[in-house]
Amino acid sequence: MKKIKWFSIILLLAVAMCGLAGCGENSNVAEQPIQEGMDYDVIVVGGDPEGVCAAVSSARSGLKTLLIEDDEALGGLMTLGKLNFIDICESRDGSILTQGLFMEFYDAVGGTAFDVETAKQFFYDCVVNEKNATLKLNTEFIKPVMDGDTIVGVVVEENGEQATYTASRIIDATVDADVAAAAGAPYTVAGEDIGEKERHMGVTLVFELSGVNWDKVVDYLENDDNEGTGATDKTAWGYTREGYAYEPKDDLMRLRGFNVARQDNGNVLVNALIIFGVDAMSEESKAQGIARAQKELEYIVPYVRENFIGFENVELAGTASQLYIRESRHIIGEYQLTIDDVLENRDQWDKIAIVAYPADIQPTAGQTYGTVIGSPDRYAIPFRSIVPLEVENMLVIGRSASYTSLAAGSARVIPVGMAEGEAAGVASAYSLNNAISFRDMSADEAAIADVQKTLKKQGAYLDDFEVHEAFMEHWAYPGVKVIRSLGLLDGGYSNDYRLDEPMGKWRLQNMINNSLKKTGSDFALVEDITDPVTNGNMIAVAARLADVEADSYTGQLSGLQEKGIVTEEILNHMGTEHEAPMAAEAIMIVANLYNYYLAQ
């Protein structure tokens, strides 16, 4: 493990608490000289909310901090992407779990929905009011500066020229983990970890409308006898039927229900337009996606006038300059958060945030709807998940941190990354003050306890917890975990896997084919499941796939038992040959068949 030699260090007497209203300067921090030969203690690359939190946290911890952003303003997706309807991390009892710096933002901008210009100013003030922070806008990351496997700085382009800045610690807050990837950290792309590298999850272009009659919107959505719609003085959600009824001119577009948030000027921002076929790693593809969406809006706006109550007189006032992209790289760190961590509400010994959000997988081309794998009450983000493998002196925060692709469906939301950013700043101070690497910290209980103690003082919610889910007691849950981990089983918002319902033909056939495809094995696609499904037909198909040479039902069962595909527990729950299998039995058999193929 490489360690940079210290020449002059003054230990911090206290780490500053985050309690300032409006992000004013925190004067209660000790001055600390940087390491000899370094320009800064910490460089944060990426000015989205996650990066702002990291930079502010680092600066308040007494570290000389540089924040680099390649655009003209801070806030990223929330400001330039105009996504002003926050995905709040709430537990089932309604408690907001992300506190600390996130709550400073939440309180300052007025809650769940906010004015974009207000947010933009807030983020700017947060950084420039910190005496230990330096902000560089319109500054593009070009490449990392490396000393072996240790990152010691970044090369950037500013004012048309390249410049190099060095630091003892680097925090990658870019949305695609560009710095970590360039430095050599391992990663997967999209759903690569479950055999879906080429999937391009739908992206969104937020658009702005003027001329909305808000009183009519509220009256309609509050009285349409639909529990899933509603409106407040600032937000509205609904028009699902109207949205999905729109027939796009571009086949790679979908309009869905509206999530709407008002601006201070009376206009509204709408999150509803899904764009397919956009490669999140290609600037050209993203630019084309924006252009295609803007063209489609020429047809959408007249449709909205004719079909959306309260929108009869709207005009298009503009669009975001950035796409809302939900997935690109997934860095591999000391620990990868899994979908089981999320949906089993797991605590972590090294937690730096407690969060909650449904595991929401957006549709891809050809799909009308996305998938909700499940919905947790709460779970913990471990420090290990922001420590990338193979690169020293770096942390990675935000949606491209170390989560599996399914777990990222939940952990990708902005408040999670903001909490990680605050923790990254505190961890950087601990790392420098104690001459310990991030990697060593990730295995050091005392170090993590110190970081957690500081975060709690600053307002973070990090209490230990234990939340148990009833579905985990089901006898077939081991099979659920296998199939769910492949992205082939969803429980929706209520975590209902329909285990005790009869298994349908298409559900079973698709589950078999798609799970076995993910093993990389050659097999004949299953196309002969009967409708309705019987135990006899299901067992015959499984026997054929497992090369069991038997014609009778009992012979096939015996052969599958020998291969571990049918177990005594499954037999104890199965009915007769001619009865329909419940989903529980079918899922267990498919899971065992998948594991059998993997072992070949």
What feature does the model see in each segment?
Residues 1-10:
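Bacterial N-terminal signal peptides that target proteins for export
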Residues 18-22:
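C-terminal motif of bacterial Sec signal peptides marking the signal peptidase cleavage site
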Residues 24, 162-163, 167-169, 177-449, ...:
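Flavin (FAD/FMN)-binding glycine-rich loop and adjacent Rossmann-like elements that form
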Residues 34, 57, 63-64, 69-143, ...:
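Conserved N-terminal/central alpha/beta ligand/cofactor-binding core
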Residues 36-48:
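Beta1/beta-strand and adjacent pyrophosphate-binding region of the FAD-binding site
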Residues 51:
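N-terminal Rossmann-fold NAD(P) dinucleotide-binding loop
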Residues 145-164:
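Conserved beta-strand-loop-beta-strand element in the redox core of flavoprotein oxidoreductases
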Residues 485-600:
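Terminal recognition/anchoring or ligand-binding modules at protein termini
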